[in-house]
Structure formats: structure tokens, C-alpha cells
Swiss-Prot record:
Name of the featured protein: Metallothionein 20-III isoform A
Entry annotated with the keyword Metal-binding: yes
Induction: By cadmium.
Residues that coordinate or bind Cd(2+) 6: C53, C65, C69, C71
Organism expressing this protein natively: Mytilus edulis (Blue mussel)
Keywords in alphabetical order: Cadmium, Metal-binding, Metal-thiolate cluster
Positions annotated to bind Cd(2+) 2: C19, C24, C38, C41
Function: The metallothioneins are involved in the cellular sequestration of toxic metal ions.
Positions that bind Cd(2+) 5: C47, C51, C53, C57
Subunit structure: Homodimer.
Residues reported to bind Cd(2+) 4: C45, C57, C63, C71
Cited InterPro entries: Metalthion_mollusc
Domain of life: Eukaryota
Amino-acid positions noted as binding Cd(2+) 1 in the UniProt annotation, renumbered to this chain: C15, C19, C32, C36
């Protein structure tokens, strides 16, 4: 049985308990709310300081951070 967020096998992205799945995308772009765990996710986007990644962030190459923030 695949993990709850093994997006490649299930095509479903389920975020950790109490975590928002807003803007969550399946496949290689599986993503949960900031600070939430999702086993099987392969996307890493780090924004500067306390800034969060934007909804259309799908990886380091097109990392999108909140307005006025930069991706590092």
C-alpha cells in the first residue's frame, strides 16, 4: 500500500493531519501548506525569511514566493 501522499502511484496528494491541502497539486508537484509533512513529495521551494511559497509553486525552477519575497 503506497503512502498517503505517494502522488506518483495514487495521483492523490493528502497533507498531514490538521494541515491545509489548499493549492496542493498531485504528481511531481505534490505540495502541502507550509510546515506540513507529506510523504512522497519531491518538491522543495525555500522562500526568504518567514515568507511562504505561492500556490503555483511546482519546484525550485519556478519557485514562487509571496509578494515581496524571494526564493533562495
Amino acid at each position: 500500500m503506497p503512502g498517503p501522499c505517494n502522488c506518483i502511484e495514487t495521483n492523490v496528494c493528502i497533507c498531514g493531519t490538521g494541515c491545509s491541502g489548499k493549492c496542493c497539486q498531485c504528481g511531481d508537484a505534490c505540495k502541502c501548506a507550509s510546515g506540513c509533512g507529506c510523504s512522497g513529495c519531491k518538491v522543495v521551494c525555500r522562500c526568504s525569511g518567514t515568507c511562504a511559497c505561492g500556490c503555483d509553486c511546482t519546484g525550485p525552477i519556478n519557485c514562487k514566493c509571496e509578494s515581496g519575497c524571494s526564493c533562495k
